[in-house]
């Protein structure tokens, strides 16, 4: 009976805490727009933080399927599917590549949307980094999932262009794939 009281007291103590703290990896709109010069480096670092997970599959998606790399034998690694030309839909490495790519695109696009240009040269330089990151990600996504540009860029399918996060994610429409030229 004593253990039940102790557990009940511990449960009440845990639930009754009124301290509200935001996760360290998130920034609310008020903090972001109140002082852009202080919040911009943190937001941009968030983009680069996603690239840590993204960079490993980035070069593998492009190089393993080509003839630049030769691996002898077999492997159980998910990227071995690229070398053997047998991709499966549940390849977790491809899923991570796709997910983190669009996380970088969303973060960079939201920064571009929320922070005005022309405020200072430092802000414009950092906005340029956001434009670059978004373009670089689309390039690598198109390289991994799209058709070659040299064949027919007007009709070859590229990637869905999603610049930002939707205001209403529940009713958001998924975009069509754009062409490689777009």
Q: What residue ranges belong to the model's regions?
A:
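Bacterial Sec-dependent N-terminal signal peptides
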Residues: 1-26
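Short, surface-exposed recognition loops and adjoining beta-strand edges that mediate ligand/DNA contacts
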Residues: 29-30, 34, 58-71, 147-155
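Secretory-pathway/luminal and periplasmic proteins that interact with or process carbohydrate-rich
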Residues: 52-57, 71, 137-148
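Conserved, well-structured interaction surfaces
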Residues: 79-146, 174-178
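Short coil/linker segments at helix-helix boundaries
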Residues: 144-182
């Amino acid at each position: 009976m004593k253990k039940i009281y102790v557990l009940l007291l511990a449960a009440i103590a845990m639930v009754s805490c009124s301290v509200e703290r935001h996760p360290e990896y998130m920034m609310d709109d008020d903090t972001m727009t109140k002082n852009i010069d202080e919040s911009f480096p943190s937001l941009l670092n968030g983009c680069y933080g996603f690239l840590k997970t993204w960079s490993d599959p980035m070069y593998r998606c492009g190089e393993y399927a080509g003839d630049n790399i030769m691996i002898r034998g077999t492997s159980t690694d998910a990227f071995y599917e690229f070398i053997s030309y047998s991709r499966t839909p549940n390849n977790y490495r491809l899923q991570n590549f796709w997910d983190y790519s669009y996380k970088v695109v969303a973060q960079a696009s939201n920064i571009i949307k929320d922070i005005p240009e022309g405020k200072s040269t430092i802000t414009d330089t950092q906005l340029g980094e956001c434009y670059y990151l978004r373009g670089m990600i689309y390039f690598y996504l198109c390289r991994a999932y799209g058709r070659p540009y040299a064949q027919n860029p007007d009709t070859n399918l590229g990637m869905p262009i999603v610049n930002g996060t939707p205001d209403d994610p529940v009713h958001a429409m998924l975009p069509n794939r754009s062409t490689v030229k777009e």
